[in-house]
Regions:
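Histidine/acidic residue-rich metal-binding segments in metalloenzymes
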Residues: 1-47, 61-64, 76-96, 143
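His/Asp/Glu-enriched, well-ordered alpha-helical/loop segment
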Residues: 4, 67-70, 78-151
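Short acidic, glycine/serine/threonine-rich loops at helix termini
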Residues: 58-62, 110
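Glycine/Thr-rich phosphate-binding loops of Rossmann-like dinucleotide-binding domains
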Residues: 34-36, 57, 106
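Non-cysteine beta-strand/loop elements that form the S-adenosyl-L-methionine
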Residues: 45-57
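Active-site-proximal loop/turn and secondary-structure-junction residues that shape catalytic pockets
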Residues: 11-13, 51-53, 102-104
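Residue-level detector of flexible, active-site-proximal loop/helix-junction positions
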Residues: 33, 54, 134
């Protein structure tokens, strides 16, 4: 049908199935494996890592009583996990689009995503392109929006 589709995925099996079925992008991708990364490269699937959301959950887990005790270990682990997954996916060659899962963290802090992306190894210009031209290409509207040009 030519639709742009996204899957909110954390587990590798769900990602593998979504990518195999032709999903346009994977959001979060927390437990992404190298097998999934390779399939994403093969299928041209984009990855929207939302590192800032994972880091925000991790920080909130350090506040006593913020989450139920049973949730705290998982919440503490998600920030480092999603950060490491992003670094591996970027280095492997998965196409990256900027995204933050806004609402998980304080409004106005989405720019932190650039910081996390560059700290994990993405050059600053590629991080900027992940928020401008790359999503425009993913959406098929790169002739209309996405470029930053003089003039």
């Amino acid at each position: 049908y030519g639709m742009i589709t996204a899957a909110h995925e954390h587990g590798a099996e769900g990602m593998k199935r979504a990518v195999a079925a032709g999903i346009t992008s994977i959001e979060h991708g927390t437990m992404m494996t190298e097998e999934v990364m390779d399939l994403m490269i093969e299928k041209g699937t984009y990855y929207v890592p939302t590192i800032t959301a994972g880091k925000a959950v991790e920080e909130k887990a350090k506040i006593k009583g913020y989450y139920p005790a049973v949730v705290v270990p998982k919440a503490l682990a998600i920030g480092p996990q999603i950060y490491n997954t992003f670094g591996k996916a970027y280095k492997r060659g998965v196409k990256i689009c900027f995204g933050t899962d806004a609402g998980v963290f304080t409004h106005g802090e989405n720019g932190k995503e650039f910081y996390y992306m560059t700290q994990a190894g993405m050059p600053a210009m590629e991080a900027i392109q992940s928020a401008t031209m790359t999503p425009a290409i993913m959406l098929g509207i790169e002739d209309e929006i996405g470029s930053i040009e003089a003039g």
